[in-house]
Amino acid sequence: MIEIKNVNKVFYQGSKEILALKDINLHIAKGTIFGVIGSSGAGKSTLIRCVNMLEAPSSGSIIVDGVDLTTLSKKQLVETRRNIGMIFQHFNLLSSRTVFDNVALPLELAGKDKSQITTKVTELLKLVGLADKHESYPSNLSGGQKQRVAIARALASDPSVLLCDEATSALDPATTQSILELLKEINRKLNITILLITHEMEVVKSICHEVAIIGGGELVEKGTVGDIFAHPKTELAHEFIRSTLDLSIPEDYQARLQPNRVEGSYPLVRMEFTGATVDAPLMSQISRKYNIDVSILSSDLDYAGGVKFGMMVAELFGNEQDDSAAIEYLREHNVKVEVLGYVL
């Protein structure tokens, strides 16, 4: 279990004070895969580095398995960190050591005997799918294989918590998915708590049980993945959800798009559907109710946390009054509608 209580972090550039984290409060239950998402500079990397005290909070508490890390001596902190594994975007493997020896390093530093090390490393390499790579060197591995070695090394001391700092950002989509599947398997088999940070909502959608959204060093929104996708409360949450869907406006429409309605133009709208609104026949309802035609240019549908969500870009053909009434009807039925402009 991880508790982050009233955490603030201040950095200084000369005399300038930069508040990187502002009063962050999170509770991460044991065995959960918890995602923290934010854009570059949002403070998410600073937050995850505070969890194992690579960065000490300026104020607040970091409690892992009942122990407040901010109260520990350096010696106590070194011992406690063995219970917290961490992997990074860059794999940080030692190029002069084999795969086996890279994974063995934490065990050697902990003073384990040779037979214990051999048993543990063999078990971990099998877990991460590298049972045949004991004697390989990092230079002979793919990016995904290097990250698997890093994961095995992070698990060597049997931690209860695994921190993942943009662990898939340097990988291609197929390799990213395989690493996420491995993390899910590790979570399931070992009941290890995983805290990961990312700037990709696709990662959150694929693996996380709960998610927190951070912007400008502040906690913007948090909840189960299903709740966030079904009922996003902030514009930042909407932006991240939109990023998971492939929705584009044809170039010829973009060229004809006007900022204001003029004679002969019609509104182009983007609609976001979540939860029950996905299955509701709202397009046919507004077509009948307000005597308008709906031309769908693009749409996409996906699932996250057991919840369906979707987006649509469409042109509405009616008079100005009926178009406005139809848009208001959609909003009353919990559809987020944005008028992108008017097509001439």
Swiss-Prot record:
Location (main, coarse): membrane
Pfam families (alphabetical): ABC_tran (PF00005), NIL (PF09383)
One Gene Ontology term, aspect cellular component: plasma membrane
Domain spans labelled ABC transporter: 2-241
GO molecular function per UniProt: ABC-type D-methionine transporter activity; ATP binding; ATP hydrolysis activity
Top-level taxonomic group: Bacteria
Subcellular location per the Swiss-Prot or TrEMBL entry: Cell inner membrane
Residues annotated for ATP binding in this entry: 38-45
SUPFAM superfamilies to which the protein is assigned, alphabetical: ACT-like, P-loop containing nucleoside triphosphate hydrolases
E.C. numbers: 7.4.2.11
Keywords recorded for this protein, A-Z: Amino-acid transport, ATP-binding, Cell inner membrane, Cell membrane, Membrane, Nucleotide-binding, Translocase, Transport
Catalysis performed (reactions): L-methionine(out) + ATP + H2O = L-methionine(in) + ADP + phosphate + H(+); D-methionine(out) + ATP + H2O = D-methionine(in) + ADP + phosphate + H(+)
Assembly and binders: The complex is composed of two ATP-binding proteins (MetN), two transmembrane proteins (MetI) and a solute-binding protein (MetQ).
Function: Part of the ABC transporter complex MetNIQ involved in methionine import. Responsible for energy coupling to the transport system.
Protein name per Swiss-Prot or TrEMBL: Methionine import ATP-binding protein MetN
Higher taxonomy: Bacteria, Pseudomonadati, Pseudomonadota, Gammaproteobacteria, Vibrionales
